Amino acid sequence: VTVPVAVAVLAYLALLPSEEVAPVPGSPCRAGGPARTDPLLAPDLDGDGFGELVYEESADPDGFQVVVVPGSARGPVVGRTTVLNREELGVPDSVQSIDDTWRPTVADLDGDGHLDLVVSGDARVVWGGPDGPRADSPRGRVPLPGAPYHTVPVAGDVDGDGHLDLVAYRFSAKNPALVVLKGPFQRSGAPADTAEIPTPVNEAAFPALLLGDANGDRAADLAVYDSPYDPPLLLTGGADTPSGLSAEPERLPAGESVAFGDFDGDGRRDIAVGQSFVDPYDDEETPYRRGRLHLAYGKEPGTWVTMEGGAPQEGFGTWLGAGDFDGDGCDDLAVQLTRKKEAADARFAVLHGGSEHGLASEPWRTFRRTVAEPSGPVDEGPVDGSLFAAADWDGDGQAELALFGGGHWWFTDGTDRDKASFVEPGRAG
């Protein structure tokens, strides 16, 4: 049984570019003292104070690898890249790889103070150390019950006991389920305990998982989204259940992307849901309407505000990235606009956080990144960069957006300038 979504406030606002953001009297944003409590920094694998760019990629089924690009005061430094291949990661040839660039999970699973890598749907672990993951690093495997698992588990403390847990989705025709593996983890990869939740979505779905604190209680909450058959669902953490997640999920407004952030600077977590109306498989024509952004602020839980953005059929809301892009202490929200999910077109509108009511209703910054001649043997140009992640890769206390497309990476604060950009390692020429 699911809880019906409550939409108490509904407003439709057309989003148009805005050159300046007027300061709001009494704004809760505090430059140098962010209202949020979660770290901005991208995962710092080698402990040098700068976060690394970490991603999985496979140009072909046999080419599965994890790429680690070290961070610096100028952003990722491609000349110091480490590439871990399938053999070094301990991923067997039988494990299915994916075609798209993907994020492995980075988390301290054993509590030794070093970040570890969890890669592939087979949940292989490369244990961290003072110099980060290396080809000769100790390895393990998290035992996942049943099969198959096509995407890497996500990490967060779902039961609030101070140890990071992993959550995975089992794509099984007979018994699809959310699987929660409790920390701390042994060096073999074995969890302290395991619990299963029967799938809350359609059995044919391949949902995405997002762990984050949606309600400010310090326990990680789970968003299950990007199912063409179901609305996004929220399972709150810290529950008195075997898994630590709530027994009944909360239905969120319809949409395909979810982000958590503190957009009004009040110290409470807010939820954003993007609804582009673009068919997930590009089989049907997009209806002649604007995309939507649904927002629920922590100060008014259960109350949703809806804004429309972009022009009709532009796909406003395809992907969302939350982060403080100007260092004022409030999270902002980058919204990707994509006309076709399988096409290489993408533009962005950044909504500024910290106004009297939270996110501004007009874009603060609009931008796109395009490569006219993509690198690699199969890409055809031009290709736009799509959202990969939002984090602080240069240690300046402000988040950057990482975009990837056509073998190119861009790191930007949403303006026309890049803090860093480079061709993907191994694809130049």
Model feature map: region roles:
Residues 1-39, 70-99, 127-148, 182-204, ...:
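Blade-edge motifs of beta-propeller repeat domains
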Residues 33-62:
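Beta-strand-rich domains and repeat architectures in extracellular enzymes and scaffolds
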Residues 47-56, 111-120, 160-169, 216-225, ...:
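Acidic/hydrophobic-patterned starts of short beta strands in beta-sheet-rich repeat architectures
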Residues 36-47, 100-109, 150-158, 206-214, ...:
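Beta-propeller blade termini
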Residues 203-242, 247-294, 299-300, 310-318:
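Beta-propeller domains
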Residues 58-62, 171-175, 227-230, 277-283, ...:
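Short glycine/acidic-enriched loop and turn motifs that connect beta-strands
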Residues 53, 68-69, 104, 117, ...:
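Hydrophobic strand positions within the blades of repeat-based beta-sheet folds
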Residues 255-258, 272, 280, 288-291, ...:
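Hydrophobic multi-pass inner-membrane translocation pores used for secretion
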